[in-house]
Amino acid sequence: MSEAEPTATLCFVDTNIWLYAFISGPDAAKSNLARQLLRDSEEALVVSSQVINEVCVNLLKKAHVPEVEIQDLVRSFYRKYPVVLLDQAVQVSASELRGRFSLSFWDSLILAAAVHCGATILYSEDLQAGLEVDGHLTIRNPFAS
């Protein structure tokens, strides 16, 4: 993505996008694209507590990031971005979305959190790119050509 989304557009970013940005691995192209997306959309980004948890557990297990850095990262997420908590409304919405779209439990929570915060774009490598939800949220795969 070469231009930033307008600041009125809220963008929810799924876990794998964050992980590509944080971990330099064998797929440098995806890492670079993820970093660019996060930079370009920084003012419009929204995350959920689930995404923060998933990022942290993967950084601990796969990248062996020290706990002190994980603590700093958690604080940074909460300081820099709106964080959607997985409350009753989000969980009930996730259940409804699972029924409508045949999603996994965890993917439905991601989608419900994105809908709940009013995001218009959900960046995800895992969910169905192009899917429109309730007429205002579109799933985009930032790595698709």
What are these regions (language model features)?
Residues 1-47, 62-72:
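Short, well-structured N-terminal submotif of metal-dependent ribonuclease cores
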